[in-house]
Swiss-Prot record:
Post-translational modification: Phosphorylation at Thr-286 by MAP kinases is required for ubiquitination and degradation by the DCX(AMBRA1) complex. It also plays an essential role for recognition by the FBXO31 component of SCF (SKP1-cullin-F-box) protein ligase complex following DNA damage.
Organism of this sequence: Rattus norvegicus
GO cellular component terms given for this protein: bicellular tight junction; cyclin D1-CDK4 complex; cyclin D1-CDK6 complex; cyclin-dependent protein kinase holoenzyme complex; cytoplasm; microtubule organizing center; nuclear membrane; nucleoplasm
Subunit structure comment from the entry: Interacts with either CDK4 or CDK6 protein kinase to form a serine/threonine kinase holoenzyme complex. The cyclin subunit imparts substrate specificity to the complex. Component of the ternary complex CCND1/CDK4/CDKN1B required for nuclear translocation and modulation of CDK4-mediated kinase activity. Interacts directly with CDKN1B. Can form similar complexes with either CDKN1A or CDKN2A. Interacts with UHRF2; the interaction ubiquitinates CCND1 and appears to occur independently of phosphorylation. Interacts with USP2.
GO BP, sorted A to Z: animal organ regeneration; cell division; cell population proliferation; DNA damage response; endoplasmic reticulum unfolded protein response; fat cell differentiation; G1/S transition of mitotic cell cycle; lactation
Name this polypeptide is given: G1/S-specific cyclin-D1
Single annotated GO MF: transcription corepressor activity
Main localization of the protein described in the UniProt heading: nucleus
Known role: Regulatory component of the cyclin D1-CDK4 (DC) complex that phosphorylates and inhibits members of the retinoblastoma (RB) protein family including RB1 and regulates the cell-cycle during G(1)/S transition. Phosphorylation of RB1 allows dissociation of the transcription factor E2F from the RB/E2F complex and the subsequent transcription of E2F target genes which are responsible for the progression through the G(1) phase. Hypophosphorylates RB1 in early G(1) phase. Cyclin D-CDK4 complexes are major integrators of various mitogenenic and antimitogenic signals.
Residues bearing PTM Phosphothreonine: T286
Cell location: Nucleus; Cytoplasm; Nucleus membrane
Domain of life: Eukaryota
Annotated family: Belongs to the cyclin family. Cyclin D subfamily.
Record-annotated Cyclin N-terminal domain positions: 28-152
Length: 295
């Protein structure tokens, strides 16, 4: 009797059906033209910030990613929040004691832009171990949006991934795997300051190629083999193939170092032994197998 009134409904997010009109070349051209308008400065650590250094950005970015993952935020929230953070730091000097406040505020605003049910100020304050108050976060929100001149609809690599996949004659199940791994690479790139200089379209294209190469989805005789895919996507985003290939190699190197760091945190002794073997064997010329990554 007590189970008769038990509610077994599961809340699902209602999503619109894919619209092919939003994936045509005209939209992509407009996105490529717009992406530069919301790009942060690549030299703000030297020219603007006095206390904040790249290692601090890495720490707060990792924390922001963990919060977004634990709250199961949309994939676009974290890269968009990092775009806000970098653009703000490109304009305004900030004390290092307020960097976590800025990170929480960027997630707060980004979730309003991309989430059906955005993160609350109170919940974000809990993730800071109550080191900030909701009132401080709301005040910082006003400062953030004013400094960004309310230009909050910035392009992120996620906006380009679907365009690239729609142009590839891959099977739907393969596209789903590529999409998932490419999204993981995009989040990983957002934590690393080296990728600030790359436009979102290049990060997205590099992530797609890196995902395909790691998953071995491109055969040598296939149009979508990694070499041809790189040239194809470089034409799509109108960039030099060598620049795109360099971005892809950066992504693969970042993935490899992240996996090594994660393994070191689990078993430091085993990592030291593996490091000695790697030094003798030299660096591998093939990228890390992305199937080893826990998505």
């Amino acid at each position: 009797m007590e189970h008769q009134l038990l509610c077994c409904e599961v809340e699902t997010i209602r999503r619109a059906y894919p619209d092919t009109n939003l994936l045509n070349d005209r939209v992509l051209r407009a996105m490529l033209k717009t992406e530069e308008t919301c790009a942060p400065s690549v030299s703000y650590f030297k020219c603007v910030q006095r206390e904040i250094v790249p290692s601090m950005r890495k720490i707060v970015a990792t924390w922001m990613l963990e919060v977004c993952e634990e709250q199961k935020c949309e994939e676009e929230v974290f890269p968009l929040a990092m775009n806000y953070l970098d653009r703000f730091l490109s304009l305004e000097p900030l004390k290092k004691s307020r960097l976590q406040l800025l990170g929480a505020t960027c997630m707060f605003v980004a979730s309003k832009m991309k989430e059906t049910i955005p993160l609350t100020a109170e919940k974000l304050c809990i993730y800071t171990d109550n080191s900030i108050r909701p009132e401080e976060l709301l005040q910082m929100e006003l400062l953030l949006v004013n400094k960004l001149k309310w230009n909050l609809a910035a392009m992120t690599p996620h906006d380009f991934i679907e365009h690239f996949l729609s142009k590839m004659p891959e099977a739907d199940e393969n596209k789903q795997i590529i999409r998932k791994h490419a999204q993981t690479f995009v989040a990983l790139c957002a934590t690393d300051v080296k990728f600030i200089s790359n436009p979102p379209s290049m990060v997205a294209a590099g992530s797609v190629v890196a995902a395909m190469q790691g998953l071995n989805l491109g055969s040598p005789n296939n149009f979508l083999s990694c070499y041809r895919t790189t040239h194809f996507l470089s034409r799509v985003i109108k960039c030099d193939p060598d620049c795109l290939r360099a971005c892809q190699e950066q992504i693969e190197a970042l993935l490899e170092s992240s996996l090594r760091q994660a393994q070191q945190n689990i078993d430091p002794k085993a990592t030291e032994e593996e490091g000695e073997v790697e030094e003798e064997a030299g660096l591998a010329c093939t990228p890390t197998d992305v199937r080893d990554v826990d998505i």
